[in-house]
Amino acid sequence: MKNVTVYMGPMCNFCDAAKRLLNRNNIPYKEINITIEEDKMHEMLSKSNGKRTIPQIFFDNHHVGGYEELRALEKENKLENLLK
C-alpha cells in the first residue's frame, strides 16, 4: 500500500472530512499540520504545484488534490486501485 500524506491545518472542515473519509476506508495516513511545521508548508507548495488550499493529499508522490478530489475517487471506487 502506498503512503498517504495529508497536509492540513487546524479548524479546517475539509481537512476533517478528508480524515474521516480515510478512516472510514481504513486507509492509514500521515498528518502534517502546516501551521506548526512551517517548512512543511513550503514542501506542500512545491509538491502541489503551488496549491495553497488545505487539505492537500498525496498517495506516495501522486498528488490527489483536496477533499473534493478524494471524495470523487471514493465515489468512483478508485481509491483501492490508486493505493496499490
Locations of the language-model features?
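Residues that form or flank phosphate/diphosphate-binding pockets in enzymes
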Residues: 16, 39, 65
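Thioredoxin-like thiol-disulfide oxidoreductase module
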Residues: 34-50
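Non-catalytic, surface beta->alpha helical segment in thiol-disulfide oxidoreductase systems
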Residues: 59-84
